[in-house]
Amino acid sequence: MNNNLQGDAIAAAIDVLNEERVIAYPTEAVFGVGCDPDSETAVMRLLELKQRPVDKGLILIAANYEQLKPYIDDTMLTDVQRETIFSRWPGPVTFVFPAPATTPRWLTGRFDSLAVRVTDHPLVVALCQAYGKPLVSTSANLSGLPPCRTVDEVRAQFGAAFPVVPGETGGRLNPSEIRDALTGELFRQG
């Protein structure tokens, strides 16, 4: 996609996000659906769309670490833990950090932590940079159906009018690996 078309698609996506709605976009492995993490209305729309309970918690995807800092508590990280995390970012590894009390429950669910990732997908980086903050990100699929890997699959599952940022996934076969930021424990193999 040329830069003008990508810029137009990102601008249109930001308009949708500002309306507290949900968008779809390509990530490292599959298409994701996402929204403004600070909008309870938008997150509830996403959870309803996915038929996902709020208590499960969500993942935030960001252009850089600074975008994630308001949502996580990194004060307990040692220098070695920081090095480990930053050696994997940007990239397809999600880390679960402690969350401060100010992080909304609609993001953390029943947990006192939050899963976050600094992406290396160029389109998502550009989207988060243009929006100025991270996005809630979960796989684009309706309950019981496989995650979408193309724009056509997103439209087939969510409807022709669903707002999609067109582009290619990063080509990975599996969703992101998920690890505990403090212990390194593997929660999901990538």
UniProtKB/Swiss-Prot annotation:
Compartment(s): Cytoplasm
EC number: 2.7.7.87
PROSITE patterns (alphabetical): YRDC
Reaction(s) this enzyme catalyzes, per UniProt: L-threonine + hydrogencarbonate + ATP = L-threonylcarbamoyladenylate + diphosphate + H2O
Enzyme kind, highest EC tier: transferase
InterPro entries: DHBP_synth_RibB-like_a/b_dom, Sua5-like_dom, TC-AMP_synthase, TC-AMP_synthase_SUA5
NCBIfam families: PRK10634.1
GO molecular function, one term: double-stranded RNA binding
UniProt entry keywords in alphabetical sequence: ATP-binding, Cytoplasm, Nucleotide-binding, Nucleotidyltransferase, Transferase, tRNA processing
Name listed for the protein in its UniProt record: Threonylcarbamoyl-AMP synthase
BP GO terms, sorted: regulation of translational fidelity; tRNA threonylcarbamoyladenosine modification
Function: Required for the formation of a threonylcarbamoyl group on adenosine at position 37 (t(6)A37) in tRNAs that read codons beginning with adenine. Catalyzes the conversion of L-threonine, HCO(3)(-)/CO(2) and ATP to give threonylcarbamoyl-AMP (TC-AMP) as the acyladenylate intermediate, with the release of diphosphate.
Gene Ontology CC terms: cytoplasm
Gene giving rise to this polypeptide: tsaC
Keyword Nucleotide-binding: yes
Keyword Cytoplasm: yes
Family, similarity comment: Belongs to the SUA5 family. TsaC subfamily.
YrdC-like domain boundaries: 7-190
